[in-house]
A protein has these predicted regions:
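Sec/Tat signal peptide C-region and signal peptidase I cleavage site
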Residues: 35-41
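Scaffold/interface architecture of coatomer-like assemblies
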Residues: 41-360
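Bacterial N-terminal signal peptides
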Residues: 23-35
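N-terminal secretory signal peptides that target proteins for export/translocation
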Residues: 1-20
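Generic secretory/membrane-interface signal
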Residues: 2-4, 21, 32, 79, ...
Length: 360
């Protein structure tokens, strides 16, 4: 199924299907790309940072009117985070070690747990555009190994490829074998596809932002527990209907952490340059993830997956009930500290809206 030039309409909630069925004509295949998954449990959204501007205006401040807001389903704020010092990840923190501020006001911590055993939903987003021609086999091997080592019976993963199209190669599964079969079928596509810049002739490009938006909005938004997206890409987007801002916004609303592994066949295509890398750093930072640049080195790619795996094993979940109970739509800035000299990786804030608000 493929993402067309127009943004997908929100699909009706339904039980998770074993396969996708066609819901629209070929020109509107985007509406059939994904079903909303069955909710495992009701989960309160974790904090969200303000979405970044598009790369074309990345140096300009974000205007308040341009920022969409995030609904808080219950009066509880969840903060997933990891902590590191110069020697690596810290795994023995307690509630008493940490302090959380909302708009510079200390908040009483209600819950504090390690998240190693919480169900995990992983979306792998695989760039299959021309820049990946000689590194795709490396990505396939390392990605399959990562999921084989990370997935437990209570976890699930899905696989999306993106180039001139956005394709769902594997729907939710906890079978590493099924994911590997799907990864092995991924192939480079530089021809004509169904996703394009509207009104600009033959569809072409790399629909990175569209892929992130669809993965977050249509696949992860109704899932509970920990949710991550792992992008393997050179960071360059060409032809997406979505923007950096809207794709990050979708990830924030889904409470998904975005990790980006920058990889490309730079010998033939060069690197997309500072714009793509800067966009990926902004996307990762705003969602509580990070960027790992591996060039076109297979060993460094495996190490990048190992780093993500280690981070997932050392995450914490901190929850608190805001002292300001108003669901007034204001942006609440968060600042989390856990002792001196520790690097805390977490989201930067959230918007408080009433649970029954229809606005996204």
């Amino acid at each position: 199924m493929r993402h067309s030039a127009s943004r997908p309409a929100e699909l009706p909630r339904a039980a998770r299907p074993s396969s996708l069925r066609l819901l629209a004509p070929a020109a509107l295949l985007v509406c059939a790309l994904f079903y909303l998954p069955q909710m495992r449990a009701q989960d309160a959204p974790s904090p969200s940072g303000p979405p970044p501007p598009s790369s074309a205006a990345s140096s300009e401040p974000i205007q308040q009117d341009d920022i969409q807001t995030l609904k808080v389903g219950v009066n509880l704020v969840n903060v997933y985070f990891s902590a590191r010092d110069k020697n690596g990840y810290i795994t023995n923190l307690t509630k008493d070690d940490c302090n959380i501020q909302e708009n510079k006001v200390d908040q009483p911590i209600k819950n504090f747990t390690k998240e190693k055993n919480l169900p995990l939903t992983i979306g792998i987003l695989l760039d299959t555009s021309g820049s990946q021609t000689n590194v795709l086999p490396l990505e396939q091997e390392a990605g399959a190994r990562f999921l084989r080592e990370v997935l437990t019976p209570k976890d699930e993963a899905f696989l999306i490829s993106f180039d001139i199209n956005v394709d769902l190669l594997a729907d939710y599964t906890n079978s590493p074998r099924e994911i590997k079969r799907a990864i092995d079928k991924a192939s480079i596509n530089t021809g004509t596809g169904s996703g394009s810049v509207t009104g600009h002739g033959q569809p072409r490009g790399t629909l990175l932002f569209d892929a992130v938006y669809l993965a977050a909005h249509d696949k992860l938004r109704q899932e509970a527990g920990r949710k991550i997206l792992v992008l393997l890409t050179d960071g360059g987007d060409q032809g997406s209907q979505e923007t950096l801002k809207t794709s990050v916004e979708a990830a924030q609303k889904a409470n998904a952490i975005v990790y980006v592994i920058l990889i490309a066949d730079r010998g033939n295509f060069g690197t997309f340059g500072s714009i793509g890398a800067a966009d990926m750093r902004r996307m990762a930072s705003e969602t509580g993830g990070r960027v790992i640049d591996v060039g076109n080195n297979g060993r460094r790619l495996e190490d990048a997956f190992d780093q993500i795996q280690e981070e997932l094993r050392t995450q914490y979940l901190l929850s608190y009930t805001p002292l300001n109970p108003k669901t007034d739509g204001t942006y609440r800035k968060l600042e989390l500290t856990c002792g001196k000299g520790l690097n805390i990786q977490a989201r930067k804030g959230y918007y408080a809206l009433a649970a029954d608000s229809d606005k996204d």
